[in-house]
Amino acid sequence: MLGYGMYYNIVKGVETDLYARAYVLEDDKSGRKVVFVNAEMAFITIAIKRGVMKRLERKYPELGFAEDNVFLSAQHTHSAPGGYSHYGLYNMSTPGFVPEVYQYIVDGIVDAIVRADTNKQAGSIRIGRSSFAIDKEVAFNRSIKAYNRNPEVKTAIAEEESYAAVDRNMIMLYFEAKNGNPIGSVNWFGVHTTNISNDNHRICSDNKGYAARYLEESMMKKGHPDFQAAFAQGPAGDITPNWIVDRKKKWTRGKFEDDFESAKFNGKIQYDVAQEATDNAAKQEEIPAFIDYGLAFVDFRNVIIDPEFAWDDKEARTGPACHGVAFFSGTKEGPGMDPVVATLATTLARGIKTAELAKAKLSKPQIAKPILDKYRIQGKKDILVEAGECKILGTKDIKNLVIPNWADPAVHAFKKFHANGSLGNKPWTPQTLPLQIAVIGNIALVGVPGEITTIAGQRLQKTVADVLGPRGVDYVLITSYCNAYCGYITTYQEYQAQCYEGGHTVFGEHTLGAFQTKYKQLAIEMTKPFNDRQQLKNDQPTSFSDEELSKRSFNIRTQKRLIQIDD
């Protein structure tokens, strides 16, 4: 499975089916259309987006879809199959790329898009709103220490009041046919889809999947069997559904000891508020019939930060992806490496930093500069993995890494793939990412290729709203896990705490500033006439050959480690 990064978190059965829900929106006047997809999986990868586009363009060119107007998102369940990224790091616990899983996902998403386009009909869109009462046990901030560092937080919030460090609002797009019959809805609320823990072996759509089922079943009882309900993610980076410390498991859980019951409990709360948002939407005016979209590809290895977002750092920029010890240590709801090993890793990381900085002092400028830049850009992070430069603990000689194979099966897999040459010299995680904005009436959907924290999401919303507000955008909705996955996006202040989220904010302490800089640039282009816009696609993500992938593929039909489906 994908999400927890644990080698033992493998599939042995199926608890719920997994769905991709697609919504095609078309403006008859301009002829423009956009498709929004929400899939029950951990996150969209570049490989999945490319696979979907390749099939749509080859098999269904008449539908008029291109990468600019196809908006792929995921609801982030950690209990769905993994192995569908072409980048090495995200497949290490699988272990490897799994062609069958990749193909099933691509086929399912394409089928959903084609069905949605085939069944489209004249209708309207309304906005519904609701919120979670403070006593509803639905979401909690798992990184209060980092959250409280933000200047937006005027009074520090105590750990036991972490429910207050959450955006408790839900916003919905409600789709209605011309005859008044409901067609479907998409709502946004940020909370991790992690009620089901890393000791699970059954495929499940988790809390948001149950919420979607409850709303669809409710609509079916009202005579609307084709109603589709997507529970999409907002800024969920630091938000968990778990708050009770499980003494047996040594991590936090939801309402009940049975994780599936906790997921249903949380899903029911989300469903109840979604039902309120549905009722609210029915009372609202239709939004304007207008469609627009924009897409940019950005190489995040060297983004110069707009001074507006640089926090007085005149040299603020990003660098190649680095993962910190804090990332590998995990969270309250999903622990990572053993604390003793984490302490050792921290000591090694700091020792390597000292040695490299000493080397820089004695080296020529062309050798010293990359070293000095790395540690300045990454700030307080204790660097364990340099995914952008293909290093672990400062070395590219992965197969001879000092960490023994028995210490971590994922490390064993890394060594194996390095030895057979399948990792090559290409980055282990995406360095070039797609940024997407879709405008639907007076709403802007911002597709973020990663996990953005609560306050970081608010800042990004404001950045886009400041540009697109004057052209009629009243709402900016952050949609996480879109089109690709780069890890986390914390604020500059949160990053300094180096909690899990900061350790997984890979492009350095100014990562959010880089996203604000580039989304602002994309939004500015979208204020121009459609045909006068600059194409922001010179940078493209890394491509991998079939030969490279075959050397690190895990084929579920041929490998000795068989996946047994028991029902």
Where do the protein language model's features map onto the residues?
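Non-catalytic substrate/cofactor recognition surfaces at enzyme active-site rims
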Residues: 1-567
